[in-house]
Structures are given as C-alpha cells and as structure tokens.
Amino acid sequence: MAQDIKNEEVEEVQEEEVVKTAEETTPEKSELDLANERADEFENKYLRAHAEMQNIQRRANEERQNLQRYRSQDLAKAILPSLDNLERALAVEGLTDDVKKGLGMVQESLIHALKEEGIEEIAADGEFDHNYHMAIQTLPADDEHPVDTIAQVFQKGYKLHDRILRPAMVVVYN
C-alpha cells in the first residue's frame, strides 16, 4: 500500500510536470505564431509598398515619355495658321514668280520642320473619316461621287503621332 501511494504521488508529480510543460510551451507557441503572423504582415506591407513604388516609377516614366513625344504640340498649333496663310498667299493671282518662289520655300521649310517633330498632314481624299475629318458642308451624292466621300478640302488637318492637332475641314458627298 505504501508502494501504491508512492506510485500515485510519482504519477501525480509527473502529470503535473507534463501539464506545466504543456502550459509553458503553449504560450511560447502562441508567441511564435504571433511573431510569424506579424512577420508575414510586415512582408505583405513591404511587398505592397514595393509594388506601389514600381507603379509610381512606371507611371512617371510614361508621363515623361509622353511629355517628350508631344512637346511640340502647342508650338505646332501656333504655327499651323501661318502655314495656312502662306498657302493662301501662294494661291493669290498676280504674284511675281520670285515672290511665289520665296513663299514656296518658306512653306517647304515649315512643312519640313513640322515633319521632323512628327507632325503630319491628314490625308483628305477618298473616304470620309469622322476621326480625322470635320464635315462643314455636304453636297448631294451621285453616280460619280459615292456617299461619304470627300468633295473638297477647306482647311488641311494635322496630327502629331496619334493625336489630332486639327481635323481636316472638308465638304462631303451625302
């Protein structure tokens, strides 16, 4: 019987030690789990911040490229009326050949400078395209002139790469 009491006491002590060790390891595991969760949270925040910085840099680069690509837009819009006036001056009757030649040279140099900056004249012959042309008048269509074709150009249109600076003002068969 004394032996049984001793065995029971030993078992109780062992059980208490097991319970104590389990209680001691449980908080450690939960602290470790909390630390891992916080580490994961910080890693996610870091990855998001890193991705956001990359997006900001990409957008800034795109914006810089667009500014560079379209830098001459305002200047071109200011020069186009002068180019139109030169064209009208060349169409006037009674100018001497020397004056026409001089005006033609100025016109050519302006057109060349605009082309170097990526500014092109919009083609205004054939089919009417509302993206590039502005119909300011219509004429009745017939057998020779199908519907939605351009009859006459009142003012040339220009584009800078893929941007329309000014649509071509045209007369359209309707």
Swiss-Prot record:
HAMAP family: GrpE. Keywords: Chaperone, Cytoplasm, Stress response. Belongs to the GrpE family. This is Protein GrpE. InterPro entries: GrpE (IPR000740), GrpE_coiled_coil (IPR013805), GrpE_head (IPR009012). PANTHER family: GRPE PROTEIN, GRPE PROTEIN HOMOLOG, MITOCHONDRIAL. It is found in: Cytoplasm. Residues 1-35 are annotated as: Disordered. One of its GO terms (molecular function) is adenyl-nucleotide exchange factor activity. The lineage of its organism: Bacteria, Bacillati, Bacillota, Bacilli, Lactobacillales. The gene is grpE.
